[in-house]
From Swiss-Prot:
It comes from Mus musculus. It catalyses: L-seryl-[protein] + ATP = O-phospho-L-seryl-[protein] + ADP + H(+); L-threonyl-[protein] + ATP = O-phospho-L-threonyl-[protein] + ADP + H(+); L-tyrosyl-[protein] + ATP = O-phospho-L-tyrosyl-[protein] + ADP + H(+). Residues 790-803, 1091-1108 have a biased composition (Polar residues). The modification Phosphothreonine is found at residues 799, 980. Its main location: endoplasmic reticulum. Inhibited by HSPA5/BIP in absence of stress. Perturbation in protein folding in the endoplasmic reticulum (ER) promotes reversible dissociation from HSPA5/BIP and oligomerization, resulting in trans-autophosphorylation and kinase activity induction. Inactivated following phosphorylation at Thr-799 by AKT (AKT1, AKT2 and/or AKT3). Inhibited by ATAD3A at mitochondria-endoplasmic reticulum contact sites, providing a safe haven for mitochondrial protein translation during ER stress. Belongs to the protein kinase superfamily. Ser/Thr protein kinase family. GCN2 subfamily. This is Eukaryotic translation initiation factor 2-alpha kinase 3. It is an enzyme of class 2 (transferase). Residues 815-827 have a biased composition (Basic and acidic residues). The lineage of its organism: Eukaryota, Metazoa, Chordata, Craniata, Vertebrata.
């Protein structure tokens, strides 16, 4: 019996295994229960609220990790309840009453706490094990065609329409999906749900105390939990949407978004009170005591401002005074939510508020409406970002509250009579970075960013918004309200307001936000200053006057004349009116540059606004007298009749009568180019003086010359003594009332502007070109206005001649102190008398019958204004300008061409004959039309771009049978012949012109002879040129010329015959044998063009040349 009942070894072993099994079964109950949670949720429909990745995350809740980084925190983990039982009471030290924590929720599902009073040091970090807040299978925008669904973290959906570039709320919420499925399209049905999980945490240590869900609650260390410990309640809301096919039930896409909400339970409050909605803040004495403790410790955070930067994942603290950065902490993932826990209160930090909030929750009566309006104006924003390749939205509370919750209210959402309009967000994204230019992003660029983001997955998890790279780095802000926000900063401010009077100042501007824009503000201020200065100087200050050259001197006038001129100038300026006048020249043409002056006017290069071709526009000031005006109009009539390839082409002409002083002001603008250093206003061509030589010998050192103005009422006169001794070059530029020249025996390069009064001003003087008073045909330095200190103002001994100018065309020529636009007063006509024209000379009187190689020069210059009277000043008459549109040629003329080729080797014989032949053909055409040029010289011969020779400057062209009755009226040069003005270039004038005899078209033949000789025989110096050409005029040719060119010598000798009848016709010159033996390209073609184009003038007139402008001869 004993033996039977005695347990054997096998029974003992079996009993031992049973005891061990029971012990193991008890310890496995909790894990087994936790493993049932996901299965139960799935069975009861809660699993539908979790994404495919979230179904496996629920078991991880039981093993949450807590990382305590504070030095005072406990080292134990939340998942190890055993270690917490042996912990000392250090929690009491870790949670002083005045301590403040910043709780941060990130998109990866972690919760972190920062100590706001300890330089933002991380207090603890908790991974609750529930996974990321955002997960989705939506990867490409092509899923919905031109529309795209973007989820928001709070569970709402937005639909982005690419066509309309707008973001609007999808007409359903997750709550409505719990009641019934909603059909999104013809082939898609949307279903969804949400799950709630609540976590209880120790406020200051981060220890996980319990977890509650729909399946129940699990607690840790409930026996050792301190009753006085503050508890943080984290409630995670996870919402899931799935799209399935209505027929097959297959899933097309899904997404899951979630967010945390934070509650604070101070001290003895039961944890079930929050879940059962029985928690009443401030309902016990302990809360009152805590509030009193807060008031005592608030001084430690008096000047602290907490900011959360969503785009940079930073939490920062600034001092309110001065905006100094006290501390900052940057997370590795985007921030989803933020709260400030301070002494029994949880202050949510808004992610869409760019100004400050207080911690006070008290109502302010009348100010409540103002505060709400201010909040609505700034909080209505949406932040668009990307996490692990999925777009998501963070919307403000204001936008979420506007979403309709009833599907019935949205039945006519697509119609015009919608019951509740959907909230719409205009697609005007704002870049988060305030230091970069805030540009707007179009839908095309946004699509491009989406397509480039296909690799934005796990490798971009640390760069959460990888879609939005520079310049759109880290995200967009979309304003919900119509008026766009003025500020671009995404940093949100929370202030600690400690004084009672701060409670009424609900929102205050951030004191440091403008510091990000200091560069833009400084640049804007600087730009405004520069623009204002420029506008003021242009509108209210006159243009600076051209500085006087060294060769220019101040006019010497009497004080009486100065005062009268100044008064007239001021009155004219005050009476000037510009309104209502439109210039045809400025309307049809775009001025390019002023090419030069000569031939009665000024020549501009201008571009036609219609055909985009450049033309030469010649402007001539017409005189008021009818007969004198007819002389100027003769050039227009002559040009209009001339249709020949060797003559500068005429296109159009018109008259303009601008208001007083308008033209002078425009000249100051047009003639700023230093390359055209002409005076800014020109004299009237017909108001120029007439010259009367009282001796038949025009080059005698004792001649007396009177220059008499055609207008009898002008009585003001002045006397001028002209001194010599100055030297100039061929490129000397004439300034007002100044003429460049040389001494009596010096070299000069300008032989065509000796006494050129034509353009002492651009608008008012006549071209008295090369009407020199001595034998040297070069330019001479005539300074009509020297200073008193000049030694040349003294009278010198020697021969003298008297020149009397009754009008020079520039009434106030001596008043150079006035602005250039005010120099001319046509109504102030004065009689000007030039006297004491002295120049020493060693020439004998026997040389008076011929052109002297070294003629006499004047030596002194003086002004004598003795007859000025105020009563003689009369109002000026309106100025009339004639504009002539001509062909544009190269600026280089034949004179320049020869000056650059000063040796026989540089001048090919065939080229020279080719140039001369083209000139002769043009002259022959003129003669065939019954016209003569009378002023042929190298400076009047131009070239086109294809080297075709053009004869220009027809200011002296006149008919061969012109009526000679003009002599009795104009009497320009009574000692000369009877044609217009008799002001041709003297060096190339025929003997009959110089001696004042009647002449015919043979004067052009004489000039052609000299031009042919000068082409074939180059000169090394201008002095040599004057001397040899003077001898050639007397048929004294150089030996080298006669030996090298015998045929040309005979031809030139015939052309320079003293008798006009013995000179050949232009036709005979063209048919000369010297041209037949030469072969050069273009001769035959040129002559054919001459015949064909002259017969079809209308057709040719429509083919303007777009090259360079002609320089009228000087």
């Amino acid at each position: 019996m004993e033996r039977a009942t005695r347990p054997g070894p096998r029974a003992l072993l079996l009993l031992l295994f049973l005891l061990l099994g029971c012990a193991a079964g008890i310890s496995a109950v909790a894990p087994a229960r936790s493993l049932l949670a996901p299965a139960s949720e799935t069975v009861f429909g809660l699993g539908a609220a979790a994404a495919p990745t979230s179904a496996a995350r629920v078991p991880a809740v039981a093993t949450a990790e807590v990382t305590v980084e504070d030095a005072e925190a406990l080292p134990a983990a939340a998942g190890e309840p055993e270690s917490r039982a042996t912990e000392p009471d250090d929690d009491v030290e870790l949670r002083p009453r005045g301590r403040s924590l910043v709780i941060i929720s990130t998109l990866d599902g972690r919760i972190a706490a920062l100590d706001a009073e300890n330089d933002g040091k991380k207090q603890w970090d908790l991974d609750v094990g529930s996974g990321s807040l955002v997960s989705s299978s939506l990867s490409k925008p092509e899923v919905f065609g031109n529309k795209m669904i973007i989820p928001s973290l709070d569970g709402d959906l937005f639909q982005w329409d690419r066509d309309r570039e707008s973001m609007e709320a999808v007409p359903f919420t997750v709550e409505s999906l719990l009641e019934s499925s909603y059909k999104f399209g013809d082939d898609v049905v949307l279903v969804g749900g949400k799950s709630l999980i609540t976590y209880g945490l120790s406020a200051y240590s981060g220890k996980l105390r319990y977890i509650c869900s729909a399946l129940g609650c699990r607690r840790w260390d409930s026996d050792e939990m301190e009753e006085e410990e503050d508890i943080l309640l984290l409630q995670r809301t996870q919402k899931t949407v799935r799209a399935v096919g209505p027929r097959s039930g297959s899933e097309k896409w899904n997404f899951s978004v979630g967010h945390f909400e934070l509650r604070y339970i101070p001290d003895m409050e039961t944890r079930a009170g929050f879940i059962e909605s029985t928690f009443k803040p401030g309902g016990n004495k302990e809360d009152s005591k805590i509030i009193s403790d807060v008031e005592e410790q608030e001084a430690t955070m008096l000047d602290t401002v907490i900011k959360v930067s969503v785009a940079d994942w930073k939490v920062m603290a600034f001092s309110r005074k001065g905006g100094r950065l006290e501390w900052e902490y940057q997370f590795c993932t985007p921030i989803a939510s933020a709260w400030l826990v301070r002494d029994g209160k949880v202050i949510p930090i808004s992610l869409f508020d760019d100004t400050s909030y207080t911690a006070s929750e008290e109502a302010l009566g009348d100010e409540e409406d103002i505060v709400e309006a201010a909040r609505g104006a700034t909080e209505n924003s949406v932040y668009l970002g990307m996490y692990r390749g999925q777009l998501y939205l963070q919307s403000s509370v204001r936008v979420s509250e506007k979403f309709p919750t009833s599907p019935k209210a949205l039945e006519s959402v697509n119609g015009e009579n919608a019951i509740i309009p959907l909230p719409t967000i205009k697609w005007k994204p704002l870049i988060h970075s305030p230091s970069r230019t805030p540009v707007l992003v179009g839908s095309d660029e946004f699509d491009k960013c989406l397509s480039n983001d296909k690799y934005s997955h796990e490798e971009y998890s640390n760069g959460a918004l990888s879609i939005l790279q520079y310049p759109y780095d880290n995200g967009y802000y979309l304003p919900y309200y119509k008026r766009e926000r003025n500020k671009r900063s995404t940093q949100i401010t929370v202030r600690f307001l400690d004084s009672p009077h701060y409670s009424k100042n609900i929102r205050k501007k951030d004191p440091i936000l403008l510091l990000h824009w200091w560069k833009e503000i400084f640049g804007t201020i600087l730009l405004c200053i520069v623009a204002t200065t420029f506008i003021v100087r242009r509108l209210f200050h006159p243009q600076p006057h051209r500085q006087r050259k060294e060769s220019e001197t101040q006019c010497q006038t009497e004080s009486k004349y100065d005062s009268v001129s100044a008064d007239v100038s001021d009155n004219s300026w005050n009476d000037m009116k510009y309104s209502g006048y439109v210039s045809r020249y400025l309307t049809d043409f775009e001025p390019i540059q002023c090419m030069g002056r000569g031939g009665f006017g000024v020549v501009f290069e201008a571009k036609n606004k219609v055909d985009d071709c450049n033309y030469a526009i010649k402007r001539i000031r017409l005189p008021n007298r009818e007969l004198a005006r007819e002389k100027v109009m003769r050039e227009v009539k002559a040009l209009a009749k001339l249709e020949h390839p060797g003559i500068v082409r005429y296109f159009n002409a018109w008259l303009e009568t601008p208001p007083e002083k308008w033209q002078e002001e425009m000249d100051e603008i047009w003639l700023k180019d230093e390359s055209t250093d002409w005076p800014l206003s020109s004299p009237s061509p017909m108001d120029a003086p007439s010259v009367k030589i009282r001796r038949m010998d025009p080059f005698s050192t004792k001649e007396q010359i009177e220059v008499i103005a055609p207008s009898p009422e002008r009585s003001r006169s002045f006397s001028v003594g002209i001194s010599c001794g100055q030297t100039s070059s061929s490129e000397s530029q004439f300034s007002p009332l100044e003429f460049s020249g040389t001494d009596c025996g010096d070299n000069s390069d300008s032989a065509d502007a000796a006494y050129n009064l034509q353009d002492s001003c651009l608008t008012d003087c006549e071209d008295v070109e090369d009407g020199t008073v001595d034998g040297n045909d070069e330019g001479h330095s005539f300074e009509l206005c020297p200073s008193e200190a000049s030694p040349y103002t003294r009278s010198r001994e020697g021969t003298s001649s008297s020149i009397v100018f009754e009008d020079s065309g520039c009434g106030n020529a001596s008043s150079k102190e006035e602005p250039r636009g005010n120099r001319l007063h046509d109504g102030n006509h004065y009689v000007n008398k030039l006297t004491d024209l002295k120049c020493s000379s060693s020439r004998s009187s026997s040389e008076a019958t011929t052109l002297s190689t070294s003629p006499t020069r004047p030596t002194t210059l003086s002004l004598d204004f003795t007859k000025n009277t105020v009563g003689q000043l009369q109002p000026s008459s309106p100025k009339v300008y004639l504009y002539i549109q001509m062909q544009l040629c190269r600026k280089e003329n034949l004179k320049d061409w020869m000056n650059r080729r000063c040796s026989l080797e540089d001048r090919e014989h065939g080229v020279c004959l080719h140039i001369f032949l083209q000139i002769a053909e043009a002259v022959e055409f003129l003669h065939s039309k019954g016209l003569m040029h009378r002023d042929l010289k190298p400076s009047n011969i131009f070239f086109t771009m294809d080297d075709v020779v053009k004869v220009g400057d027809f200011g002296l062209v006149t008919a061969m049978d012109q009526d000679e009755e003009e002599q009795t009226v104009l009497t320009p040069m009574p000692a000369y012949a009877t044609h217009t003005g008799q002001v041709g270039t003297k060096l190339y004038m025929s003997p009959e012109q110089i001696h004042g005899n009647n002449y015919s078209h043979k004067v052009d033949i004489f000039s052609l002879g000299l031009i042919l000789f000068e082409l074939l025989y180059p000169f090394s110096t201008q002095m040599e040129r004057v001397r040899i050409l003077t001898d050639v005029r007397n048929l004294k040719f150089p030996l080298l010329f006669t030996q090298k060119y015998p045929q040309e010598h005979m031809m030139v000798q015939d052309m320079l015959s003293p008798s006009p009848t013995e000179r050949p016709e232009a036709t005979d010159i063209i048919e000369n044998a010297i041209f037949e033996n030469l072969e050069f390209p273009g001769k035959t073609v040129l002559r054919q063009r001459s015949r064909s184009m002259s017969s079809s003038g209308t057709k040719h007139s429509r083919q303007p040349s777009c090259s360079y402008s002609p320089l009228p001869g000087n």
